[in-house]
């Protein structure tokens, strides 16, 4: 009989078992393939039972993955808690000051924190704050025996957690309440909440700092630590926006490591730093005298140090130092040499000036003559200008520094301006017109061009030679030739021409609007040249009635306020007008006293609105230098040969130099 194994024969004599057995026997026999290499480290008897569960082919939703996911979540929670514990140990919280650190014992074990080894005194003590009356008749002494309930930011989270726990389970609330009552002694007295214990720690300090007299608490702590008042070292700025370079900063509740690190962190921001670090029950107290590279206000300083020190701004005292207090300067100087201070940078000049022996010897008494000499050299006769400008040089001038330290500054300024005006008036009265023009020319810086003045006169159809002759007699003060009148319509440059000349000569302006006063001519007594601008018909009538002798160039009498009458020769006078005084018969007696020049053409302007012909001090200086001989002005070399002094005026006493 043929072998039908592995075929699909249909013979009836072949049973199902035989046909099926043939297939299974073939598969069972072929258990090893030809050419396969079996590793020596494998077990020949290994049937692969350990790889049965390698592929998870369980149906979804049988409930076993819930336990596995829960295990993973618990492991992750344990890891996070371990990391959080390490962080709390080595990295302080950025949201709380170290004054909250003592409350950690209470948070971890409130019952252990309630145990006290010492006795709590029942005597009444002086309180900085008055406790509110509870309404149950307890006295202040009774209230003092038990801690008061204070809710601060550092305990809010724990209290909220306990409250939610009690509200969530009513049965446990009752059980806990009975247990606490038994621990308290079983006398039925209601136990204090757990949050009341935190006030005994450093969190009570936060409640004090948040009170209305927070600054008083900090000032008291400062005096307790440093032995002197904070206000003795600083001056007060009412506004927090006022900028200053030097600041005195005291910070409370700083971590020890941060307090040591601020000595290096503050150096790139400032030019000078004086730092003192002292321990305190709130943490470390840092006192700094800082000179920043740029001026800062109180808000900027507070924000910067709050970031560096990790302390809220409410724990800081920030004020500028006293710059003129010798005790304050001596404190900073002496503490800088001790071992409790770390100093960086160059000592500020206000400390050096008040502590060093050399600078102390250089302090001199204020001399009014030096102030007058300075005002004379800078041509300052106004009191406000003198006070401000002289105060600016106090850092480089010892007399100015003594002036600022004086209590009579207003008197000194007034006296200095008065004396300076007297010297200027005497100097001007002594000079001739030639000397005065030379004196004014020496004060003008730069060189100009005299041609624009000549071109402007020609543009107005004014002959230059007749004008030059009249101007020569005008400067010499010849009788009836000492008044020049410039007549013409509006916008012809009359006032522009006269004002430029008056500015160069240092003259004065009188106005007919003040003619109702007896003293309106008083400025003419202190000038070499005057100007009456825009004379009207009423003004010409007044001049014809009262000022004929003034136009003559003779001696006249002038009334001065709070002074006696003064007799003087009227200085050369310029008058601008829109009325021709030579054409009106009412003023016929003024015709021989006036020299009139007519400006008939409008003053030309550029596209920018500036005059085409520039009339400034430099051009007038060039004009006088060019026409010095034509105007018959005296040569300065001739004046020195006649014995006139060539040295500048000096009002400060000194020693005469003698040649050996």
Curated annotation (Swiss-Prot):
The chain residues annotated with the modification Phosphoserine are: 93, 97, 109, 122
Under PROSITE patterns, the record lists: SF3_HELICASE_1 (PS51206)
* Single GO BP term: DNA replication
Q: What is its EC number?
A: 5.6.2.4
Keyword Signal annotated: no
Primary subcellular site in the record, as a coarse category: host cell
- Looking at the record, the residues that make up the SF3 helicase domain are 462-612
Q: Could you tell me at which residue positions the Glycyl lysine isopeptide (Lys-Gly) (interchain with G-Cter in SUMO) crosslink is annotated in this chain? A: 569
Q: Where is this motif: Nuclear export signal?
A: 108-117
Q: Where is the composition biased (Polar residues)?
A: 136-163
Q: Where is this motif: Nuclear localization signal?
A: 87-89
Region Disordered: start-end pairs: 1-60, 128-196, 635-660
Which Pfam families does its entry note? PPV_E1_C, PPV_E1_DBD, PPV_E1_N
The residues that the entry says bind ATP are 488-495
Q: How is it modified after translation?
A: Phosphorylated.
Q: Which UniProt keywords apply?
A: ATP-binding, DNA replication, DNA-binding, Early protein, Helicase, Host nucleus, Hydrolase, Isomerase, Isopeptide bond, Nucleotide-binding, Phosphoprotein, Ubl conjugation
Chain's role = ATP-dependent DNA 3'-5' helicase required for initiation of viral DNA replication. It forms a complex with the viral E2 protein. The E1-E2 complex binds to the replication origin which contains binding sites for both proteins. During the initial step, a dimer of E1 interacts with a dimer of protein E2 leading to a complex that binds the viral origin of replication with high specificity. Then, a second dimer of E1 displaces the E2 dimer in an ATP-dependent manner to form the E1 tetramer.
Q: Which HAMAP family match?
A: PPV_E1 (MF_04000)
Q: Which family does the record assign? A: Belongs to the papillomaviridae E1 protein family.
Q: How does it assemble?
A: Can form hexamers. Interacts with E2 protein; this interaction increases E1 DNA binding specificity. Interacts with host DNA polymerase subunit POLA2. Interacts with host single stranded DNA-binding protein RPA1. Interacts with host TOP1; this interaction stimulates the enzymatic activity of TOP1.
Name of this chain's protein: Replication protein E1
Q: What organism does this protein naturally occur in? A: Human papillomavirus 29
């Amino acid at each position: 009989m043929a072998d039908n194994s592995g075929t699909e024969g249909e013979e009836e004599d072949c049973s199902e078992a035989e046909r099926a057995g043939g297939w299974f026997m073939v598969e069972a026999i072929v258990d090893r393939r030809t050419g396969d290499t079996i590793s020596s480290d494998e077990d020949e008897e290994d049937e692969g039972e350990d790889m049965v569960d390698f592929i998870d082919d369980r149906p979804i939703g049988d409930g076993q993955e819930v336990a596995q996911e829960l295990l993973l979540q618990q492991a992750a929670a344990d890891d996070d808690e371990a990391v959080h514990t390490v962080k709390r140990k080595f990295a302080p919280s950025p949201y709380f000051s170290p004054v909250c650190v003592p409350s950690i014992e209470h948070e971890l074990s409130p019952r252990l924190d309630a145990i006290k080894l010492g006795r709590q005194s029942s005597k009444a003590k002086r309180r900085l704050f008055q406790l509110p009356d509870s309404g149950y008749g307890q006295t202040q002494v009774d209230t003092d025996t038990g801690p008061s309930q204070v809710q601060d930011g550092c305990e809010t989270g724990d209290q909220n957690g306990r409250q939610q726990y009690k509200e969530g389970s009513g049965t446990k609330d009752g059980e806990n309440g009975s247990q606490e009552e038994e621990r308290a002694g079983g006398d039925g007295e209601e136990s204090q909440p757990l949050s009341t214990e935190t006030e005994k720690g450093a969190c009570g300090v936060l409640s004090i700092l948040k009170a209305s007299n927070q600054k008083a608490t900090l000032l008291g702590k400062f005096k307790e630590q440093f032995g002197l008042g904070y206000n003795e070292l600083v001056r007060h700025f009412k506004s927090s926006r006022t900028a200053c370079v030097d600041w005195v900063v005291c910070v409370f509740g700083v971590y020890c490591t941060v307090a040591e690190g601020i000595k290096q962190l503050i150096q790139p921001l400032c030019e000078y730093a004086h730092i003192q670090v002292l321990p305190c029950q709130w943490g470390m107290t840092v006192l700094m005298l800082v000179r920043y590279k740029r001026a800062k206000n109180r808000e900027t300083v507070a924000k910067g140090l709050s970031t560096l020190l990790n302390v809220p701004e409410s724990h800081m005292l920030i004020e500028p130092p006293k710059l003129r207090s010798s005790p304050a300067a001596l404190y900073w100087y002496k503490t800088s040499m001790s071992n409790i201070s770390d100093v960086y940078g160059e000592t500020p000049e206000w400390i050096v000036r008040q502590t060093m022996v050399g600078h102390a010897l250089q302090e001199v008494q204020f001399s009014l003559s030096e102030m007058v000499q300075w005002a004379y050299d800078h041509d300052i006769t106004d009191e406000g200008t003198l006070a401000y400008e002289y105060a600016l040089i106090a850092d480089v001038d010892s007399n100015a520094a003594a002036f600022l330290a004086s209590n009579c500054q207003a008197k000194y300024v007034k006296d200095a301006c008065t004396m300076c005006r007297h010297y200027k008036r005497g100097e001007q009265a002594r000079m001739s017109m030639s000397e005065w023009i030379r004196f004014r020319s020496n004060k003008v810086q730069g060189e100009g061009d005299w041609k624009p003045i000549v071109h402007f006169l020609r543009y107005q159809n004014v002959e230059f030679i007749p004008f030059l002759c009249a101007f020569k007699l005008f400067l010499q003060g010849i009788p009836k030739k000492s008044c020049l009148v410039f007549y013409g319509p509006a916008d012809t440059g009359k006032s522009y021409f006269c004002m430029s000349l008056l500015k160069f000569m240092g003259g004065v302006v009188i106005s007919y609007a003040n003619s109702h006063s007896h003293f309106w001519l008083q400025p003419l007594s202190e000038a070499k040249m005057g100007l009456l601008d825009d004379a009207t018909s009423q003004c010409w009538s007044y001049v014809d009635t009262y000022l004929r002798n003034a136009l003559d160039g003779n001696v006249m009498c002038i009334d001065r306020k709070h002074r006696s009458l003064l007799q003087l020769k009227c200085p050369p006078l310029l008058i601008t007008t829109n009325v021709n005084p030579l054409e009106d018969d009412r003023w016929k007696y003024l015709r021989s006293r006036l020299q009139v020049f007519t400006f008939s053409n409008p003053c030309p302007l550029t596209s920018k609105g500036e005059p085409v012909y520039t009339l400034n001090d430099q051009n007038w200086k060039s004009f006088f230098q060019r026409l010095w001989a034509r105007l018959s002005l005296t040569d300065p070399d001739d004046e020195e040969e006649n014995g006139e002094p060539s040295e500048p005026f000096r009002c400060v006493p000194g020693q005469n130099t003698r040649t050996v």
